[in-house]
Amino acid sequence: MRTFLPFLVLFVGTAACSAAQTSSTEFAGDPAGGGPGAFGGASNGANGDADSGALAQPGTLTAGAWDDNRNYDVFTDYLSKHVPQKIPFAHDPQTTAEDAAHLLFAGDRTAKALLDVAIVIDTTGSMGDEISYLRTEFQAIASAVGARFPGAQPRWSLVAYKDVGDEYLAKPFAFTANPADTQAALGTLSAGGGGDYEESPEEGFKALNQLQWRSGADVAKLAFWIADAPQHPWRTQAFADAIDGSRALGVHVYPIAASGADEQTEVSMRSAAQVTGGRYLFLTDDSGIGGTHKEPLVPCFFVTKLDRAVARTVAIEMTGTYEEPAPADIIRTGGDPKNGRCLLGNGTQVDVF
């Protein structure tokens, strides 16, 4: 079985506008609004502000996180019960890709010395807010990463992607050691195009795989894919192939589900995270801005500010060991985490992330 190195990529998805939107920029999510996790979260998130175009300050967005490799039985149960379309990843005849990833990524990992970071953004019509939020949050996140790991020589890159028939399918920006260059590149992007719910994330991943990543076992490489829509059903194999390409490079995909994400979006995101050794992140209504965010079908999680969640995941990748958020950073929980675990109603325990 091959082993893969971890890389850092940030994906921001923007599904197209339609009459089903809850605001001028986002599709409707769960009509019930943010609530406890599917297995009984501790509290409900506040409903999102109806004015999703309101300007956010740095450190405003909130998010939870979940690790399907540490909780593989929950993941396989989820796939068996809730999967509209399973992702056909490549695998050896002796095992599935998911089983192989679980064996590789379930425990502690090797510490890394260097860091490559790519931001991949879906720039179709419905997530103009998320592009704006990313511009607001990015510099603070980059500064926090640089301050904690000054010797990691972090490099930043950007890939914008749209949908078939739009102005472009993917627009990559080369790696740079200066976060200000990436901030400037973000400023050139605008939301537009699309036309239906599904988009073309496979094109973003294909462009991601062509970036000039640093090689070596001491390089940490992650992927944060912020989106509110999955791939087109007829492009699922192409999506799986692109994720397999990222996996072969050692890219760890960290999806971040935005408002309007449906069940197939969660399936695609969690599958991409699990098979590459990333974790699943999801925006929540606790920020009070944007549209309604779907509560994921995961039983145990902490909600913190998004910038803290991203910084924590980078730290875990760089050090190779798990760390919980600081108690002061926890806004609420899904489930009742105690000593790093939640006890479910059926008597089993799961690990919090």
What are these regions (language model features)?
Residues 6-10:
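Hydrophobic helical h-region of N-terminal Sec-dependent signal peptides
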